[in-house]
Amino acid sequence: NAIQERFDQGRGSVGLADFLRRAGIRFILLRNDLQRAPGLVDPILTHQALAQSPGITRVKSFGPGVGGEPYLEKGGHRVVINQGWQSSYPALEVYEVHDGGGQFVQASTAPVVVGGTESLLSLADQGVIQDQPTILAQDLSRSDPSPGSVILTDSQRARVREIGSLNKAYSYVLSPNEDTRFVDPRDYLSVDAQKWRTQAKYEGISSLTVSSSKSDAGADLGRGPSAAMDENPSTYWVSAALDSDPWLRIGLDQPMALGEITLTTPPDSPDPQVVSVQTEGHLTDQVKLRAGVPQTISLAGTRTSWVKVLGETNNGFPMSLAEVSMPGVSVQRVLRLPAVPAAWGAPAAILLEAALDQTAACASVDLAVRCLDISSSGEEDHGFAREFTIPQGAGYDLEVTGQPRGGDALESLIQRDRLISIQADSAVVSDPRGSALAAIDGDPGATWIADPDADVLAAFAHDLPDEMRSDRVIA
């Protein structure tokens, strides 16, 4: 899964060569002749990820060229292929991992990793480990004496798996007992391995459950139930498309008298959505929610230990909620790491990693940057929180790696103190490589594309340092 995620995002990995060497892998066979289909990684992203991974080079190719030009022209008309994500590759390519091959070391020198095998690639990326073998904590007993060097990670997360699928074949991270509504298997983990999982917990409420979610296994991970209570109107929960009886239920920490609840639907949701709200001993009348408009519903001050929002009728569309708020209730979702046994002492290193599972929107294709209108979102696009305990106090050097979030704030930062600036009414992607900045960067391979679904006509403003006369605009 760790390698699959890198390829799906077109994201290179400085530790990938070490990761493969540890597994005894020397060669990678890349099949460019396979038919593209949903659920498979686009070859454009695979090539980009491999090109950005040091220690891995192409050494051989076979067969005829497949693919082709990103567009076709005839009679003055142009047809774009796969939204521009198209190039020509040999049918088969062989990549070599330098100095690949297996190795043996003494077990006493191998570090113990608390987490799953997927953490090994991230640990190699950060330089915590190289290509030496490791031991997983799940292969040891908690009663064993200190195994030596211990590394704590949040990688083995409690998810439901869509067995048989390769790409995005897992759900958002689950809280304890939340997986009871799923048909898909939680994961094929041994009883010992399940004790080392990282699980979600909610602070401020006792539980948050839904009838279904678009962020179930194989779907959009950013549309889970917590998105409806994160105080961020740009994120939202969406029920599964075939859920005929959708609902969202909030378990309170303790019974309380609730006078009202405020519901907000996404701006692009069906208008209206019809819902009702149920508490212990009270059910409201049906209420029509207008898209993007907060609606406060009276709960008559009833004392209750839970609140349930029921979708009544939506003409076949999924139910969606951007924000659910109640006076006196503040919610934060936290991922809680497994506890390290006291006998093992403090970990030598701790790795906490945000879920970077949003599908890449822009990619480099033959020296040009091409961006797609991709609607999927990541589980932790807007921040993350972790909770863990260690057996004893210890000192650590803190290292933080981040990446910029696309949007108006980033574009303003990039243009700070520049003689010229540019603003656009919309963009089809949030990636700055596809923003209005691409129109003035001097690179004909980078392009600004307006959002075709925007409510306004596509336009951008170019601010100059002073008044000047111009007799032409070149685009």
Regions found by a protein language model. Give the residues of each.
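Extracytoplasmic
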Residues: 1-475
